[in-house]
Amino acid sequence: MSDQFDAKAFLKTVTSQPGVYRMYDAGGTVIYVGKAKDLKKRLSSYFRSNLASRKTEALVAQIQQIDVTVTHTETEALLLEHNYIKLYQPRYNVLLRDDKSYPFIFLSGDTHPRLAMHRGAKHAKGEYFGPFPNGYAVRETLALLQKIFPIRQCENSVYRNRSRPCLQYQIGRCLGPCVEGLVSEEEYAQQVEYVRLFLSGKDDQVLTQLISRMETASQNLEFEEAARIRDQIQAVRRVTEKQFVSNTGDDLDVIGVAFDAGMACVHVLFIRQGKVLGSRSYFPKVPGGTELSEVVETFVGQFYLQGSQMRTLPGEILLDFNLSDKTLLADSLSELAGRKINVQTKPRGDRARYLKLARTNAATALTSKLSQQSTVHQRLTALASVLKLPEVKRMECFDISHTMGEQTVASCVVFDANGPLRAEYRRYNITGITPGDDYAAMNQVLRRRYGKAIDDSKIPDVILIDGGKGQLAQAKNVFAELDVSWDKNHPLLLGVAKGADRKAGLETLFFEPEGEGFSLPPDSPALHVIQHIRDESHDHAIGGHRKKRAKVKNTSSLETIEGIGPKRRQMLLKYMGGLQGLRNASVEEIAKVPGISQGLAEKIFWSLKH
């Protein structure tokens, strides 16, 4: 405990009501956030002679100030605690590093409903199925559904402005409701109902209805229709045979935990209508000395009580660990969801099987993560030895990408002790330079990146410049001219030139723009980490450049047409589904776009044709 913090005087002012407390260090930084049913009793426990753990001892030794917020109920305290944790990211709290919203499959409420992937708030009218663990799982499911039940997946702006069916209709992936006469209202509605049942886990009902329709078509001598329905039946059966399905058909999340070498993995299985939609592993940031019970309790609270997760609560949550506040958590989640949420820790039957699966996946993911970290650590240690540095905790690498000097993009990628830190990757659009001048581009991106205040923890130990002597000279000049408060001499600037024939393993490294460089053996772990970060930077730059080039390609031909400004250009591309759709459109179709007159439509039509 800080000598300047008077615990006895502070505790005299604390109430016995429920609430949340924030602990600050001498620098005014929040280092811990906690909740309590009885604030006075809970805070008093920090200042006893015998503390529960070394982590608590280290925490109390740094306390300079404590702020208290009283709440009406324990539920309010629980919610406020996790909001504060997300806001302050305190050093001594367990932190969930990934709180992104989960994607859903959206079936719209349009006259001719469409299927799409959806993230975020559910404002649009329609039905939502999920959550799925990631966007890939949704896209894979949508592609599968399109093959079995060919309902539309196009945007409404494209759908409303079509006069003839698109390629999806030609290859049998859409029934073509955009064009009158291609499919009856009854048939389209039937396919939509199949999708609804399928996504709700009612595969048996889908098969029963399809078999009945196939038999009817066969009896009516409609053999082509019967064969088409037969193919649908076989496709549905192939899908359902691949997946373990619980007999109960419940909605639940199953949370398994593994803990080793100071690292925790929490694995979540998403089960809806008895089907495993997918799973995801999380590696929360765990302060040293933290008990596993605190890891699980904090993770579950942050996972379900923060933002978008409150929208995806299942009816039941299975845990691999018995929580002391299990009842409070269940009551809080039920209150927020407006319905009963059960939290179970000792399931039987299928539920026990699910929990075992989650536990196994958590252990496997943790083993893989520790192995990866070990490899990264070995490589960074080897690099520090080669560069004669005490250690390398953080590296940043820069690369430039353009096409004949146009649409220049610079990338910055970041590695820490665990490898790529993708949340901190950045791209910079380079402007105001002579086209193709890579030196000026490097000069600009380095000034934008480092010519401002930087937190001490974000100052890299090594800055890698992809490009060799010339680019390294630019970096040296920039750092010599920087007027900043942080230690600009701390980062080591290292140039990397590609070898002969641009082959991996033949790179030359430079400490200075003048003089000879040096090379590392192809099997050197230090070289491997340099290659890894350089390749990441190169890929990140090219990805940004391609996006920028595609954007220009889609608009450049329209920019030359008099009377077409940014708003009209955007409207045309939106309603026509892109530049290709606009090129294929007739004058009458173009004239239907809001803000486009008949005369302007003719001008656009002939400009794009010639």
UniProtKB/Swiss-Prot annotation:
SUPFAM superfamilies the record matches: C-terminal UvrC-binding domain of UvrB, GIY-YIG endonuclease, RuvA domain 2-like
Domain GIY-YIG, residue spans: 16-94
Primary localization: cytoplasm
Function: The UvrABC repair system catalyzes the recognition and processing of DNA lesions. UvrC both incises the 5' and 3' sides of the lesion. The N-terminal half is responsible for the 3' incision and the C-terminal half is responsible for the 5' incision.
GO cellular component: cytoplasm; excinuclease repair complex
Subcellular localization(s) per the UniProt record: Cytoplasm
Family of the protein in this entry: Belongs to the UvrC family.
UniProt cross-references to InterPro entries, sorted A to Z: GIY-YIG_endonuc (IPR000305), GIY-YIG_endonuc_sf (IPR035901), GIY-YIG_UvrC_Cho (IPR047296), Hlx-hairpin-Hlx_DNA-bd_motif (IPR003583), RuvA_2-like (IPR010994), UVR_dom (IPR001943), UVR_dom_sf (IPR036876), UvrABC_protein_C (IPR050066)
Lineage top rank: taxon: Bacteria
Subunit structure: Interacts with UvrB in an incision complex.
UVR domain sequence ranges: 204-239
Leader sequence residues: none
A Pfam family the protein falls into: GIY-YIG
CDD domains, alphabetized: GIY-YIG_UvrC_Cho
GO molecular-function term, one example from the UniProt record: DNA binding
Species per Swiss-Prot/TrEMBL record: Escherichia coli (strain UTI89 / UPEC)
Protein name in the entry: UvrABC system protein C
Keywords in alphabetical order: Cytoplasm, DNA damage, DNA excision, DNA repair, Excision nuclease, SOS response
HAMAP family recorded: UvrC
